[in-house]
Amino acid sequence: MGAGFLGREVAHQAGAGGWRVIPVVRTERSAEGLRQQFEETVATDATSSSFWAELQGQWSGLVWAMAPSRESVGGDFQTMHREGAVRAAQWARERRVAMVYLSSTSVYEEADGGWVDEGSALAQDERSAAMVYAEMETVRAGGSVLRCAGLYGGERELRDRAEGPERWLNVVHREDAARAVGVALRNQGQTFNVAENFPLRRGVAGGVWAEGSKRTRRSKRVSNAKLRNEGWAPIYRAGVKDSSHR
């Protein structure tokens, strides 16, 4: 459900692994770009109750990949997570289908550079609360959650220029994040952080964000130990070309 920057990579990896993949996207324009590889791509509103009431067939897994974006604001963001993801979780529970909800490490409250794991305190802002609610409903329904760090890879490159205050930045390559979905499908009822082994240091001493900037003020270091214990390891490392760090 959702085939954007990360969801599209999940679909590609699953298809390459021999799975029958049916991406569900919100617009016909998005669907057209996927149908060359996935002929059964569907363009519809997967947040609506009618979609889930009418969805039939035998399914081995469901991935909710309508990931947070800076373009998703207000009611649309809330609908995506508080309604759409929750309906997906309820549907998966009723049909005993393994589910993975793709969330974000932005849900953590830590702001002073400390380490966080899956049990760390969570933020209370509106966007974080919406994702955490969807996470809780997913796990309660028997599904699993992947809290992904900042994504890069392909057409999305990391910025090298120093800006803003000193802080820690947690990232993960799109291909590595997509590989974690298989781990989550095999380990239902769990929450995992998906991040590279080494957070990046960014910003400058005494730096500040420009007035009106929407960039996060939080600084944290995200532990991926739980996911690594299940056999996952990042192949890529930010800033290291053709890297393989296991």
PLM regions and their residue ranges:
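Conserved Rossmann-fold cofactor-binding substructure of NAD(P)-dependent oxidoreductases
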Residues: 36-59
